[in-house]
Amino acid sequence: MCFFQQLPWPRGKGLGGSSLLNFFMYVRGNKRDYDLWEKLGATGWSWKKVFPYFLKSEDNTDPQIANNGYHGTGGYLTVSSCQYSSTLMRAFQNASSERGYEYRDINGEKQTGFSKLQGTIREGKRCSTAKSFPYTSSRKKEFAHCKPSFCSEEAIGVEFQIEDTIHKVYTRKEVIVSGGTINSPQLLMLSGIGPKNHLKKHGIPLIADLPVGDNLQDHVGTHSLNFEAKNATALLMSKLVNPLNMWDFRNNGKGPLTSFSGIEGMAYINSKRNNPKLDWPDLEIHMASGSPASDHGQILKAAVGMTDNVYRQVYAPYRGKNTFTFFPCVLRPKSRGTIRLKSTNPFEHPLIDPNLFEVEEDLDLLTEVMKECVDIIQNTEAFKKIGAKMFETKFPGCESHELYSDAYLRCVARNYVFNLYHPVGTCRMGNPKDKTTVVDSRLRVKGVKNLRVVDGSVMPTLVSGNTNAPIIMIAEKASDMIKEDNPDRKSCSREDKNRIEKNRWKK
């Protein structure tokens, strides 16, 4: 949220990273996203090349979806359909045909359309990467700052600190940085890899002058489209958390507590400037069967960085009522931000500048998808049947505009924006000769031996969807690359079983 407020940028601190706290959703993105990567210089990262790695990790438990030729079974990562469905979700599904879209598996043959969610859920509970993928190293409760150690332009190990003790570990092969889009560039810059002038400003000796921390991207959206539905069942906190639902969740892995953080459906649609024949939608809508009014301001208010004044003016009048939310967002924003060091103290958070709406077109598109959300509620029989109505309260700072007019929606979009916690791109992958890249197509840091980056920071551009599944794909592909580049390695503790039958899967 803006109006001089800071946006929350949560990260997962623990084994499994942000898969410990994400919204569960399993979305691969669009085929054309990866073909664009290849076109931009990321050789070997086209859809045809990455698709097998999605299949390799996947264990899809929904037979209606798992057997359609676009999914894997037998992998480590459990993917299942959300088993809980409210009357709001049924209205959302029925509205799809009224808007001219199909209701489909958005990870299947085509992406454009409305869909029920699939997510990394096993027996109703979160299935993080730490839970999914086996490993032999003992679990450690301590978490530490670490950074690569260098001898000239070669990574030779890692230096890290637990409590007051500094440790050094030397590598026989490579150092692999997987700190994520925020921490990986911070670690590299602290180690002397980054923009020359920025490192000089902080007195850090230069090892490699690379655009580390540039190219920051995230999906941009807003939480400000909320509705009341008198004839529907929403997820009210007072009705959600009770002994019966708790028992059903704990013992059966069923019930409303298994919902994906309240989000039930999503739609991938086209803006007026997008070519629908490409099946490369540029706008997205999440449908959540609740709103910040549903929990009396206990959880969601803080999660989106909402002020007390906004809550009192917009949401308090709807407390205790059946409300729901559309989260519209722009899938491929053109604005680019940066990650920079605040200081040389590794325990101090870096400076994050998402630079939202640097390109005005991003604001135009967000306003357009907000208008589509309003139209869905006001002009579809599916939502009229459940008595869906727009909130009649106005957001502070936009009161001078007519409610839900173009000017009002644009004002709200600009001032109540939030990022969807899908940051990528700060260690961009691509052609080594390209001055905008940090790592090559095999994820090796340019100009530095024995150093790779393996996480979402290497994405050249955002994918058209949530980033959890694509980052897992990157890790699967990277593991093969590392083995190929180190043929003299000792055998790994995890047996590498190829679970891909080449002729089985449709492309």
Feature-to-residue mapping (PLM):
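N-terminal glycine-rich phosphate/pyrophosphate-binding loop and immediately adjacent elements
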Residues: 1-55, 201, 209-211, 219-228
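Short FAD-binding loop at a beta-strand-to-alpha-helix junction that anchors the flavin cofactor
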Residues: 18, 444-462
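Glycine-rich phosphate/pyrophosphate-binding beta-alpha loops
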Residues: 23-24, 457-469
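Classical protein tyrosine phosphatase
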Residues: 33, 46-52, 91, 95, ...
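Conserved redox-cofactor binding core of oxidoreductases
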Residues: 38-155, 224-242
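Mid-to-C-terminal "cap/lid" subdomains and adjacent gly/pro-rich loops that border
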Residues: 79, 146, 185, 195-320, ...
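Core beta-strand elements of the Rossmann-like FAD/NAD(P) dinucleotide-binding domain
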Residues: 164-178, 182
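FAD-binding beta-loop-beta segment adjacent to the flavin cofactor pocket
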Residues: 328-340, 427-452
